[in-house]
Structures are given as structure tokens and as C-alpha cells.
């Protein structure tokens, strides 16, 4: 099985350089696709695909996926540092009932940042999806959603689900895709045996500009299903 790593970028070239350096140290990947969202700091020079303007996370990832020629896709934030054997979690995709998988995400101080995402629409708006941030699982475990900071899916299923919903702006696209995977009859797994350090939102404040709209879209689309 072949793997493409798709990295959307928007400025903060130093983050991308550090991410790429870690990828080069660990594990073989078959295709690296960097999609730049109209950066002004030279990040476009590192890009496989340089977009003229910032079209957001979902669009950049979908464009990257369209250029992939591999069996598996890993969507990876540029504010991450990968660890040895980090791509091993994608082997779970060989199971026919598995839709989306993700590794353990940790902060630079090694505290857990995400062990998968839980979704509960009975909680107040804005709290319906939250990171499970404790070492609660020691083997691959079912979760509602996987964070888009590092998320793997087969190319076929990504295409079947229609990719990331571009109606979101830099937030909740990952939860949406994960719920679509479950609706299609698949399971989503968190794999604590693979690790990625996530600096979390170091690439800029734009993630927080459309939280209300993103939450409304997620609830409207999924809370009654």
C-alpha cells in the first residue's frame, strides 16, 4: 500500500521546514504534496501546488488529494513534528470496516493533546466535539472523530465521501468527515502506538475566525442523524 502525505500551508515557513525535516528522518512515504494557501513569506516556494489566495484548509486538502496517486492519504498540519514509525497507524486501513485513523497527538512537553475526538450534540454549542486528552487507550480504539492535524483515510473512501466539506472554514471539517465515515458504515480508530507532536494552531489565528459558523453548520448537518 502506498502513502501520500498532504500538507496545507499558510505562511509560517519555519514550521513547514521543521515538519518536513522530521518527515525526512522517519519512515518512507511515496508522495509528498504541499498545498500553499497564498502565503507571502516564501512558503509557496516549498509547495507542490501554490494557490494564489487563501482558500482554507478543506479546499487545500481536497486539491492535494486530487493530485495524489496513492492508496492511502495522510492529511498533516504543518505545525507538527512526526516521530519514528509514525505512519504505522495507516496499516489499520487494511481492515475493510475502518474508515479514518489517527495517531496520538502530543504537545512539545509530551502531554497528550488528542487521543481522538468525542462528539455529543447534547452539550452546549462549541462543546459538542472535544479532544480526548488522557492516556485512556493503550490499543487502537473506536472514537467518534479524528483531528485533521493528522488524519489518514484511503483514497477511495475519501473520494466516496466527497472529501472535506468546503462549507467549513478552518475548523470542524475533520469532525464532519469523520461523521460521514461513520454514516457510511465505517469505524474510526485512534491508534496510541503512533505519535505526532502538534504545536496546535501555531500557523495563525484564522482558525478561530469562523467558529460560530462552523459549529452551526456541524449541528445543522449532523445533530439529528
Predicted regions and their residues:
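N-proximal low-complexity "stem/linker" segments adjacent to membrane-targeting elements
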Residues: 1-22
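A conserved acidic beta->alpha catalytic loop
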Residues: 13, 22, 36-44, 53, ...
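Short, acidic, metal-binding catalytic loop of nucleotide-sugar glycosyltransferases
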Residues: 21-30
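Glycine-rich, basic loop-to-helix element that forms the pyrophosphate-binding segment
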Residues: 51-68
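Short aromatic/hydrophobic "clamp" motif used to bind/position activated sugar donors
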Residues: 73
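Conserved donor NDP-sugar-binding/catalytic core segment of glycosyltransferases
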Residues: 80-119
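A short, conserved alpha-helix in the catalytic core of glycosyltransferases
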Residues: 90, 142-162, 167-195
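Short, flexible, basic/aromatic active-site loop/helix in glycosyltransferases
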Residues: 120-144
Amino acid at each position: 500500500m502506498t502513502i501520500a502525505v498532504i500538507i496545507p500551508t499558510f505562511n509560517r515557513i519555519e514550521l513547514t521546514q521543521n515538519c518536513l525535516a522530521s518527515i525526512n528522518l522517519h519512515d518512507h512515504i511515496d508522495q509528498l504534496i504541499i498545498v500553499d494557501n497564498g502565503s507571502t513569506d516564501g512558503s509557496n516556494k516549498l509547495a507542490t501546488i501554490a494557490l494564489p489566495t487563501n482558500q482554507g484548509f478543506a479546499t487545500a486538502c481536497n486539491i492535494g488529494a486530487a493530485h495524489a496517486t496513492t492508496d492511502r492519504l495522510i492529511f498533516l498540519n504543518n505545525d507538527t513534528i512526526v516521530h519514528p514509525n509514525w505512519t504505522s497507524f495507516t496499516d489499520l486501513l487494511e481492515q475493510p470496516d475502518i474508515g479514518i485513523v489517527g495517531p496520538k497527538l502530543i504537545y512539545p512537553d509530551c502531554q497528550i493533546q488528542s487521543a481522538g475526538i468525542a462528539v455529543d450534540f447534547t452539550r452546549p454549542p462549541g462543546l459538542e466535539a472535544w479532544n480526548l486528552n488522557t492516556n485512556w487507550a493503550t490499543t487502537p480504539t473506536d472514537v467518534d472523530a479524528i483531528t485533521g492535524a493528522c488524519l489518514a483515510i484511503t483514497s477511495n473512501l475519501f473520494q466516496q465521501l466527497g472529501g472535506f466539506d468546503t462549507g467549513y472554514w478552518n475548523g470542524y471539517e475533520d469532525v464532519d468527515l469523520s461523521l460521514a465515515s461513520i454514516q457510511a458504515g465505517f469505524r474510526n480508530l485512534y491508534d496510541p502506538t503512533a505519535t505526532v507532536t502538534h504545536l496546535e494552531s501555531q500557523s495563525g489565528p484564522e482558525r478561530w475566525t469562523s467558529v460560530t459558523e462552523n459549529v452551526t453548520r456541524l449541528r445543522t448537518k449532523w445533530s439529528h442523524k
